[in-house]
């Protein structure tokens, strides 16, 4: 996340532990003090590594459905590059031991602990301090969501890239609101149900079954 050059440049450069990767050219550049990053991926960039084992596993979880495999791969790329401009959240739905938690763990490992946040829908909607924890994160993860029938106003604001509160507990003075530049992932046994009467949530939801 290259804060000095605006959101568009986030998609072009990523900071690794061994240099700065130009996403378009795949060229690994040396560290540059003129580039100010707010996030770093916690591992080296190694172009010689292959992703075939992951692709093979994804094909297994999707019963060979290549289109869904490609969507899952594209989502991981979107998380890695902070493509919040798509204004979507992914909902991975399936029974236990179907691979949905493994996929969520893969996304978490891809960005690293410092760039991810784990929460619950109830906590996000009812705790006014929770949104502040999203600042400079790439991934907001809701694991194994049980039956939920409450408000999703904060979730809609986050995925719609609206300004959200930056209120921090035990800190006086107001902090500037910010836009969440990461993506949201939900894993559950069934699609979440909410009290939202509009189409705002439905058009942002991308449900992928893990059967």
Feature locations, PLM:
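Single conserved hydrophobic/aromatic residue that forms the stacking wall/gate
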Residues: 1-11
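P-loop NTPase catalytic core of nucleic-acid-dependent motor ATPases
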Residues: 8, 14, 20-136, 206-209
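Catalytic nucleotidyl-transfer cores of nucleotide-processing enzymes
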Residues: 16-18, 180-197
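Short, glycine-/Ser/Thr-/acidic-enriched flexible segments
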Residues: 19-21, 97, 146-147, 189-192
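Conserved catalytic/switch belt of AAA+ P-loop NTPases
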Residues: 112, 152-175
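AAA+/SF3 P-loop NTPase mechanochemical coupling elements
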Residues: 129-135, 167-187
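Conserved AAA+/SF3 P-loop NTPase catalytic/coupling segment centered on the Walker-B
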Residues: 138-161, 194-201
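A short helix-turn-beta junction within AAA+ P-loop NTPase domains corresponding to the substrate/partner-engaging
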Residues: 197-211
């Amino acid at each position: 996340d290259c804060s000095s050059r605006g959101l568009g440049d986030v998609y072009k450069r990523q900071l690794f532990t061994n240099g700065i990767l130009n996403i378009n050219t795949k060229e690994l550049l040396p560290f540059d003090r003129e580039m100010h990053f707010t996030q770093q991926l916690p591992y080296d960039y190694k172009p010689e590594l292959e992703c075939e084992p992951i692709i093979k596993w994804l094909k297994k979880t999707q019963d060979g459905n290549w289109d869904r495999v490609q969507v899952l791969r594209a989502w991981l790329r979107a998380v890695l590059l902070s493509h919040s401009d798509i204004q979507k959240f992914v909902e991975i739905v399936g029974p236990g031991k179907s691979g949905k938690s493994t996929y969520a763990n893969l996304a978490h490992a891809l960005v690293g602990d410092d760039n991810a946040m784990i929460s619950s829908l109830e906590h996000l909607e009812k705790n006014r301090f929770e949104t502040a924890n999203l600042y400079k994160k790439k991934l907001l993860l809701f694991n194994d969501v049980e039956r939920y029938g409450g408000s999703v106003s904060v979730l809609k604001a986050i995925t719609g890239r609206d300004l959200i509160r930056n209120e921090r507990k035990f800190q006086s003075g107001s902090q500037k609101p910010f836009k969440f530049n990461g993506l949201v992932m939900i894993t559950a046994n069934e699609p979440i149900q909410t009290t939202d009467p509009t189409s705002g949530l439905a058009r942002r939801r991308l449900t992928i079954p893990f059967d």
